[in-house]
Design a protein with these regions (language model features):
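Domain-edge interaction signal
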Residues: 1-178
Length: 178
C-alpha cells in the first residue's frame, strides 16, 4: 500500500530542489501536515490518515511518524534526496521490493504546490509557531509527553475555515479591483 504521507514529503523535496531551496526535516513534517489539512478541506477526501497512518500531536507540532522516522537521520541538515520504502508484501513476487512513494493524483499535487508557494519561505520555527496557535488542531489535541492522535475531522474542520477565509479575502480584493 502506498504511503501517502511519504509521497507528499517526496513531492515537497522535489519542489524544494527544483526551486533550489533547502528543506529540513522539521519544515518538511510541517508542510506535509499543512498539505494534508488542505487536501481534506479542498478535495474532501482523506488522503493520508485513513489510508495508512494517523497524525500525532508531538511537542513541535503535528507529525506523521513515517515522515519523522524516514528523515530523522538528517537532523537539522537539508534533505538531499527522496525517501524509499521497502514493501514486504512483494518479497518473492519477482517485483522490486523497494519503491519511492510518489503522488499519483493531480489534484493532490496542485494542493501541495499551493502549500509550497504559500509556505516555502517560512523557516522551521515559524511553521511550528503557526501550527501551535490557539484554535489549531495541534493546540486542541496536544498533551505533553503523549503522542495523541489528531483526528482527520479536527484537521478538516480547521483547514476548511482557513480555506473559507482565504476565499473571502480573494472575493473582497476582487470586488475592490472591479
Amino acid at each position: 500500500m502506498e504511503n501517502y504521507a511519504l509521497a507528499i514529503a517526496n513531492y515537497f523535496i522535489e519542489l524544494a530542489h527544483k526551486d533550489k531551496i533547502d528543506i529540513r526535516p522539521l519544515k518538511l513534517m510541517k508542510l506535509v501536515y499543512i498539505a494534508h489539512g488542505y487536501i481534506l478541506a479542498l478535495l474532501d477526501k482523506p488522503t493520508v490518515g485513513a489510508k495508512l497512518e494517523e497524525v500525532e500531536a508531538w511537542q513541535y507540532g503535528p507529525v506523521f511518524p513515517s515522515v519523522y522516522y524516514s528523515f530523522k537521520q538528517y537532523g537539522s541538515q537539508p534533505i538531499d534526496k527522496k525517501t524509499t520504502v521497502f514493501d514486504f508484501s512483494k518479497i518473492g513476487s519477482g517485483e522490486d521490493c523497494v519503491y519511492t512513494p510518489s503522488l499519483k493524483c493531480d489534484e493532490e499535487k496542485m494542493v501541495c504546490e499551493f502549500v509550497w508557494r504559500n509556505y516555502r519561505n517560512f523557516n522551521d520555527s515559524e511553521l511550528v509557531s503557526k501550527l501551535h496557535m490557539n484554535g489549531t488542531p495541534w493546540k486542541e489535541c496536544y498533551k505533553q509527553g503523549k503522542n495523541v492522535v489528531i483526528p482527520d475531522k479536527v484537521t478538516k474542520r480547521y483547514y476548511t475555515l482557513v480555506a473559507q477565509n482565504i476565499s473571502k479575502r480573494i472575493n473582497k480584493q476582487s470586488q475592490k479591483d472591479a
